[in-house]
Amino acid sequence: MLLCDSCNKGWHIYCLSPPLKHIPLGNWYCLECLNTDEETFGFVPGKCLLLEDFKRIADRAKRKWFGSGTVSRTQIEKKFWEIVEGSGGEVEVMYGNDLDTSVYGSGFPRIGDQRPESVEADIWDEYCGSPWNLNNMPKLKGSMLQAIRHNINGVTVPWLYLGMLFSSFCWHFEDHCFYSVNYLHWGEAKCWYGIPGSAASAFEKVMRKTLPDLFDAQPDLLFQLVTMLSPTVLQENKVPVYTVLQEPGNFVITFPKSFHAGFNFGLNCAEAVNFATADWLPYGGSGAELYRLYRKPSVISHEELLCVVAKGNCCNNEGSIHLKKELLRIYSKEKTWREQLWKSGILRSSPMFVPECADSVGIEEDPTCIICQQFLHLSAIVCNCRPSVFACLEHWKHLCECEPTKLRLEYRYTLAELDMMVQEVEKFGGCKTQETKISQRPSSGTKRSIALNKKEGMQVSQARPADKWLLRASKVLDAAFSSVEYATLLKESEQFLWAGSEMDRVRDVTKSLNKAKIWAEAVSDCLSKVEGEVNDDSMKVHLEFIDELLRVNPVPCFNSGYLKLKDYAEEARKLSEKIDSALSSSPTITQLELLHSEVSRSPISLKKHEILSKKISSAKMLAKRAKRYLTDAKPPGIEMDALFKLNSEMLELHVQLPETEGILDLVKKSESARDKSNKVLTGSLSLENVEELLHEFDSFSINVPELNILRQYHVDTLSWISRFNDVMVDVREGKDQRKLISDLSSLLRDGASLGIQVEGLPLVEVELKKASCREKARTVYTARKSLDFIEQLLSEAVILHIEEEEIFVEISGILSTARCWEERASTILENETQMYELKDLVRMSVNIDAVLPTLQGIENTISSAETWLQKSEPFLSATSSMASSPCSMLELPVLKDLVTQAKLLNVQLQEPRILETLLLNCERWQCDNHQLLQETEDLLDNAKIDDGTHSNILPKIMDLITRVDSARRSGLALGLNFDELPKLRTASLKLGWCCKTITLSSSSPTSELLEDVGKPSLQHIQQHLKEGQTLEILPEEYYLGKRLMELKDTGLEWAKRARKVVTDSGALALEDVFELISEGENLPVHAEQELQSLRARSMLHCICLKPYNSRSMVSCSQCGEWYHTYCLKLHWRPKAYVCSACCPLAETTPQIDPARATEPERPSLNQRRTRMVATDAAVNDLKWKTRKHIKRTTKRSPQVHILPWFFT
């Protein structure tokens, strides 16, 4: 027993999957604990992600390892193997592998997929049927996988793979050693490492040698896809390794039993599937044996695949060679094990269940071995103690503890059938091999005696009992039937049936025994039922079954009941002929019932018995229905079709019924009623004719459709006449016209749809027109109508002779008043008129009850004039006040539109002339200001400054500024929002800027400039240029700006040189420094701060005669001079120091305390940073505060400044 070091459960080492040969060293964990351990190596199921989320995680992983810069693939590959070998740190990535394309979709088009509109149908069909389409490749002609009936994910149905950086697939080969093809759709490349199939054994040896502990604990480690080993290690151990870099659009094919591994350089998407050509078959057999060895469940049954391919003849000549070799291998293996089981005492056998689709490979029918987990297609061992558990022939001893005699061999093919399968493949392939020649067996046509002198081994030992069995079987077949002896012989024959063609005679005799046993038992069973007087018809024996038994010739065996059964069958046939005779004539119900009673007493079931029963039942049912039709009560509602159907059924039944004559009379009367009704319907229907026919068939109970139509016509006509009389009374009494119209309309509509002609219909139509005309006249008072409507209404009244009625006389007066108003309105609209006249016409129209056509034009004219006055009000107000605030500026285009619209008004007004005057003033102002703006632009473009010329330009500019401001004020006074107002303001500001530019750029160096009086500073120049940028003035476009830019560039260039000299630590000679100072003093711009820094630079210090810098210095306590500590060779700054000039007799260096002669400790990082910041800041504001006055004359060091930057 092997104990798990986690759960402490015990396991037999031979029961493990795969079994272990010995107890492994170190800790060992069972499969359950390995699957539940969260920190185990390998792959862990991840969560479900959307593609966008997966992309985001992939990008984040790549940035984590290599940042956002570019990285070569060589660097990525190196880092990957460093991580694998443990020196590159830990990495956790996600790999979307084994995604079923039937669920998530394929990257290749499929026939069932919806075609995008952008792809043409021909191209789509071409790619759907392409052999390089991975959905088609497994089932192509020549592929062994086309024999598989079901779709197997990853084998016959492609899988999708979504990878990211460092996601990998470990060393493995495909299931069943299949070929595989992988296509990269998009993304980063995929790196492959491959081992040739010929070096697979060497590869496994190196893996076991390198990782002995893992393989001792898990011998099937390479099946788990969790082991990665560097190609370098494999190559060092003489294992050939090849590398392939797969780019998008590339196919990669792996060969059978070829170990391969790899990883992804980044986010990508690939698709892969398996396929198997005929040369794969030997590798497939090797793979199946590996599954058996390691007790791993296989994907398909390799033996079933071979049999299906062999029976289907789907291999060519070259493929048949590989197929024959594999069939011979499984034949030899099956033959050896079956013979060993026979020797071990397993004599019972039975054929396996044959599936419905035996011509294709399935995955659900075959059982699996309880030990090695393999499909049991060819044979299996089973025991009655556990009938649902099976074992293969190799592991039969582990099935149960029962004796071998209680076990049973189940087989799908006999050895003879397998041998025939090999010969068929050989015949189809067209070639023979030495192996197939050896495998051939004698045909089944050999004599019963087997030549024992030509047999050896197992065949000899099995042939002797077979001969004995055949001898016994011959005697039993010649004797009378005995169920016990037959069962014994059949049970004993099971030990021979699975064998080869040498047992064909046994199989033939067994079939004869089975046939005889089935026939004899059937005869005995039938005879027992016939003689047992069974009353239940369902338990009787059918005559057809007895005839089938009696037709067997010759009889398989002797049975004493055969002749008795023959006599019973003869009596049943005579009774059947009697039934035929009765049915062919026209019997009565009584005769049929007597015959039915005789048939029911027969011990044999006749098929015509049921026909006779149905005949009697139908006759009784028809007679019952006929009596109901012919009863004295004569119930109404009998349909004519039902009567005709009953008559037809009674005639077709061929049974004599007393009700037949009565039904026939009803049928004749119905036909007569139908013919007369049709004759009336086809002619001109009058009320008298219809009433005459209905009176004739008043008491007829059959529903004749045509007669029913006439009855309905008659009822509808009588109802309409009654309504007509009532409405005519209302017409004469002059009731409500609206209700009268409704009643007359309904009456007219119903009368037109009557099937019978009525006389009052024209009168209804005339009265309806009159009522409608009166109702229209009434609406003139409720809602105004047009003059055309009123004229038409009066015309209708004249036609209907009702024009003298009071309402139509009043309407005629309204029409005359409206005509007079229209004539006056037309006259006014033809000429311009005053507003009050138009409004008088509108007031008059209120009292006229009609729609006046010209009224809308009058109202539109008034509305247009009022709208124009409302829009003009702001301009009229601005004209009167002669001022407007900026927030209420009016637009000039609006004014122009108003002046144009005024010309279209058909009203006499004073306001349009006022707006025309205002528009003329505005256009004159625009013309004047256009010239002023052009003059300003010319002055700015052409102004030049020379020595003494600025005195001539400035007055012109000032005069122009005055004129521009005056024009702007006059434009504001007009109260309109002119486009020129902002331009005038900008021109004024630009002219002011030019004045200031002339002032800054025209200062000439005079004697006053020695004291920096009159010079502009660089800050002032830059500020002024920024103000010009705000005004959108580009200095390079104007001469004045160019001159100012030159001054700025000159000052900045000198300041840059000065800054460089100040910080050069004394590199520049003093003469050059003084020359630079002189140059700066003569600059046309003010640079005092830079000059002070240069003057400070000209001060030299220390014995090195260098200017001040940021390095450590010490001051003399007497003269105040500064010295560099490194020039004095001091390791630290003393509290007090006296220089050699002040103390010439002293030593060069002061006495230093020996205890402090060592260099102090290095300060901390924070202290050093603080000192550096302080040192930089000291450059700007250091002052020689520690200098002291001494006897000899010295100068204090001025404050030192860093030159400022003036770059914008």
Swiss-Prot record:
> What job does this protein perform?
Functions as a histone H3 'Lys-4' (H3K4me) demethylase involved in the regulation of gene expression. Active on H3K4me1, H3K4me2 and H3K4me3. Repressor of the abscisic acid (ABA) signaling pathway, especially during stomatal closure regulation. Negative regulator of responses to dehydration stress by binding directly to the chromatin of SRK2E/OST1 and demethylating H3K4me3 to regulates its expression. Together with JMJ14 and JMJ16, required for plant growth and development.
Residue intervals of every PHD-type zinc finger in the record: 1-36, 1099-1145
Annotated protein name in UniProt:
Lysine-specific demethylase JMJ17
Matches recorded under Gene3D superfamilies: Cupin (2.60.120.650), Zinc/RING finger domain, C3HC4 (zinc finger) (3.30.40.10)
Where do the annotations place Zn(2+) 4 binding?
A: 1102, 1104, 1124, 1127
Where along the chain is Zn(2+) 1 bound?
Answer: 4, 7, 30, 33
From the UniProt record, list the reaction(s) this protein catalyses: N(6),N(6),N(6)-trimethyl-L-lysyl(4)-[histone H3] + 2-oxoglutarate + O2 = N(6),N(6)-dimethyl-L-lysyl(4)-[histone H3] + formaldehyde + succinate + CO2; N(6),N(6)-dimethyl-L-lysyl(4)-[histone H3] + 2-oxoglutarate + O2 = N(6)-methyl-L-lysyl(4)-[histone H3] + formaldehyde + succinate + CO2; N(6)-methyl-L-lysyl(4)-[histone H3] + 2-oxoglutarate + O2 = L-lysyl(4)-[histone H3] + formaldehyde + succinate + CO2; N(6),N(6),N(6)-trimethyl-L-lysyl(4)-[histone H3] + 3 2-oxoglutarate + 3 O2 = L-lysyl(4)-[histone H3] + 3 formaldehyde + 3 succinate + 3 CO2
Null mutant phenotype:
Increased dehydration stress tolerance associated with abscisic acid (ABA) hypersensitivity during stomatal closure regulation. Ectopic increase in genome-wide H3K4me1, H3K4me2 and H3K4me3 levels and activation of several dehydration stress-responsive genes, including OST1. The double mutants jmj17-1 jmj14-1 and jmj17-1 jmj16-1 have an early flowering phenotype (especially in long day conditions). The triple mutant jmj17-1 jmj14-1 jmj16-1 flowers even earlier.
One term under GO cellular component? nucleus
Q: Which GO terms describe its biological process?
A: abscisic acid-activated signaling pathway; developmental growth; negative regulation of gene expression, epigenetic; plant organ development; regulation of stomatal closure; response to abscisic acid; response to water deprivation
Q: Where is this motif: Nuclear localization signal?
A: 613-620
Q: Tell me a Gene Ontology molecular-function term this record carries.
A: oxidoreductase activity
Q: Where does Fe cation bind?
A: 172, 174, 260
Primary localization: nucleus
Specify which residues bind Zn(2+) 5 according to the UniProt entry for this protein.
Answer: 1116, 1119, 1139, 1142
